[in-house]
Amino acid sequence: MVFCTYCGHSFTRDEHLERHILTHTNVKPFKCFTCHMSFARRDLLQGHYTVHGRNQDQQEIPAANGMIPKSAGRTPIACSNCAKTKTKCDKKFPCSRCASRNLRCTLRPTLVSTKNAARMGLITPETIAQDIANGTLPPDQTVAAEKVPLPIAPTGHVEESSKSSSPSGSPTSISHNSTGSDAPPAPMFDQFNGCPTPPQGLSPTTPSGQGFNGPASFPGFDDYNQQIGKTSAEDCNLHFMLDWQQLQLPIGLDPMLQPDMLGDQDLNFDMGAMGLGTQMEPILSINPELTNNMPPPLITPIETPKFDRSSSDLDAFSSGLHDRQYSVVSNQSVDSHYQAPPQPDPVVVAQDGWNVFRCVPSVHPSACPSTARWNLEALESTLQNHDGRSKWRPEVDENLFDGSDQLAVMQIHESTRDKLLAITQGFLHKALEIHRGNEAAQTYAPSNFVLLPPTKVLEYFLRSYTNSFERFYPLTSKGSLDANELMFCYQDRASSLLILLMVAQGAMNVPSREARSLTGGLVETCRISLFDLIERNIVMASDHNVLHAALIFTELASWSGDKWQMDIAMGQRGMYAAMLRHSGVLDRTTYPPQGSFSDGQTNADHMWNLWIQQESRSRPVYSWAMVDQELALFHGASPLFSVTEFGIALPHNEELWRAKSAGEWTSLMGQRVSTTDSDATASPPSLRDLSRRFLDDEMDSAECFLNPMHLRLLLLPLQAMVGHYQQLMCCFSDSGSSRVKNKTVTASSTRCRLEEVQCLLQRWYNIAMDYLKEHSVCSVMQASLVLYHLISLNAVTDFVQIERLARRETFDGTYQSLVWTHKRCITDVGEAIFHCGQVISLIRSMPRSVRPPWWAASIYRVALVLWCDSLIDKDGSSSYGGKSGQTFAVDALPSDHPLIQRYLNKGEGTPRLSKRDGSTIGLDHGLTVLNHCAEIIDEGATSRFQEGIRGKLDRLMRT
């Protein structure tokens, strides 16, 4: 079975595929020997020969009784006079009845062309006759309605035509109408709806006896006929009978190309190659009417159009899609100038409507533009730019991929890329059809084929994916990512979705227009196809590749910076969590009976394969638990999963998971047997069992062999408890305020429970420090420490109240109200400042390209907590009122430093924040703190989410 690389359709025979390919490539193998026009089908060529009156053997084709040949797809019908009198017409030209009565024989347009003209608002002989009958058009104006002189004369006849043209013969500048739609403007060939639009102030004509028989009327044809001294009856130029839709375009020009692709200076407009010769040059001279009203496939200027592209910092991508200036240059002067007004990026416009990180007043969701269709059309426009995609090379920094724990990305084969392209074509067309709806068939031409980025670019994006995603959610086994192996499995559609989402994740951290359009479009495309795949086959809900793809989509869309994608990711997060829960993968599974490592290579391979299958079920489950925990933390919600649900065994160490062969895996297992008393092949405990041991303070037992992922997952129950008790504390009046002397028993007990959870957090931190004394720090461990400090920060702050204060919702303007609000927002200032400093220190210690996707959100939380604390004056009565002691950089010292311990225990010392140049800033000025945190965000990799967080801090500084 063979596949079409353009649409993905399958064929059983090669000749069927070869015939089908012609519908995509615009290749027309059948050529006319007379005018050298090409056709896609043989029957079209046979019909075309009737225009010349000679067949392919140069033999004359006899006309049937002098009838007019069927040219341009038109069947001869009765003339207008015979049709009105309902008299039989011999369909000659002129017919015998009109000739005998000395009447003017006029060919009557067909029913289809009349309807098309009426739909476009064109003037036809029937509409003129109707207007005369109704009295709306005097009879003496019919001639003017049938033929209107052009205001600009064709090239080569300027002096002659200037006498008969309209007084306003100077070229006028006509600009495109801008729309307020949030979606990107449709391609130029779509905006014309397949038909030319009459220019303003010009009444177009419909071909009649004095015109030409073609599909549409073009300005300048009638003047051209007058100047060359030919009447319609004498004119025998067969070029006016050509089917303009079958016009052979020069090599390199595709009528489906976007306008920005016409800027290729290598494009050759050879008039002779199109079978027009030099006779068409005066007609195709550039004038405002012709340029403004013809779709790009029919524009054949004397000189290649030159485009001046501009970009905007506000719109990193749409500048290449919207903000373009088209300057068409003719032989004499610039006849027309187009300048589209800059349109803001809808993703940037919708940032004020985020449902999270709301430190500034937000707008109503109905006022935010939808970006789903915009992302898809931006992706389609980018992938259709074949020349640009083949030449595009992202800025590759090889230093970003250095490291021993980096996954290897295997080279992508051409067959893999072709199969992925075929399936992607179907995914994209399905998504466009859904979002365009009925409008697609009316205002959009059939989508041209798209091309994926070059293989080297795809491999770079996959390497970026392994560098940013796999470090925190390790799901790829054997130490290498092989897209070829994924594509040729039993479920190629699920594998294609997984690879496309990997590419989108890798392109997320590349700050270029092409990469951002690739990320936004692929996320929406894969979201629709992923949901459709699960809906068609519910068994796929437990498939490893489907769970992996859904995890990447949820994580990618949640931190994309696109409001629409962030909202729908949070909504579908619950759906995927329920799907994961109901599939049964959370239940306890045990390893099958296994032999010893000394039973031979065959048994070792068998044990290794069984072990990989078990890990492949465990790792997606706990990766989902980690993603759910992160989203719940930053959205101020409770996690969807409870600890008691996780009965499946925890994952093993990363060294075992990334073993490249059974021998390497066996060797690593043997080392574990020699260092521990437990069985290395035994199943690890589940998260439920591990949490029980942690609460019982039994983590020092020899049976518990911890790794960074285990420590990371232990934070899940602690975060859930902190969130639960903080929610209860918010229900009491002025929780933590000293002015309330007689608190209720429930409030006091809740505060005690919260303090117990803080003790458990300290126990977790001690275990983590003991682990780091024996092992080197890794990305998962760094992220776990940041989450620990953020959870501890939640225990001493009310972040929802802090954001309300930033929006001026809980502040009446008095200092007393500000002090009360501050006490409600921050219950322990010293603990809050300590954890904020540690978060900044950990984020800065991470490489800028190897950071969790939520790192900017953590800096945002730190900025608002420190800003809130800077609003009030510190006095001597406060526990942390700046007592005697030296100043210290709270974000530059480890947690066990004596200065930090003295500050936490006795309140001595003045904490400050350090800068890259070694200087420090105080914490008593809110604008300085916000600006410092904004500079920290600028130090990281650029993304839409990072830019959105940076913009919110800027707006808060201006309020």
Curated annotation (Swiss-Prot):
InterPro entries: Transcription_factor_dom_fun (IPR007219), Zn2-C6_fun-type_DNA-bd_sf (IPR036864), Zn2Cys6_DnaBD (IPR001138), Znf_C2H2_sf (IPR036236), Znf_C2H2_type (IPR013087)
Keywords: DNA-binding, Metal-binding, Nucleus, Repeat, Transcription, Transcription regulation, Zinc, Zinc-finger
GO CC annotation, single: nucleus
Top-level taxonomic group: Eukaryota
Pfam families, A to Z: Fungal_trans (PF04082), Zn_clus (PF00172)
Gene Ontology terms, MF aspect: DNA binding; DNA-binding transcription factor activity, RNA polymerase II-specific; zinc ion binding
Segments for region (Disordered): 154-226
Changes seen on gene knockout: Blocks the expression of the elsinochrome cluster genes RDT1, PKS1, PRF1 and HP1, and impairs the production of elsinochrome.
Biased composition (Low complexity): 163-178
Zinc finger (C2H2-type): 2-24, 30-52
PANTHER family: TRANSCRIPTION FACTOR WITH C2H2 AND ZN(2)-CYS(6) DNA BINDING DOMAIN (EUROFUNG) (PTHR47660:SF2), TRANSCRIPTION FACTOR WITH C2H2 AND ZN(2)-CYS(6) DNA BINDING DOMAIN (EUROFUNG)-RELATED-RELATED (PTHR47660)
Biological function: Elsinochromes biosynthesis cluster-specific transcription factor that positively regulates the expression of cluster genes including RDT1, PKS1, PRF1 and HP1, and subsequent elsinochromes production.
Protein name: Transcription factor 1
Organism: Elsinoe fawcettii
Gene responsible for this protein: TSF1
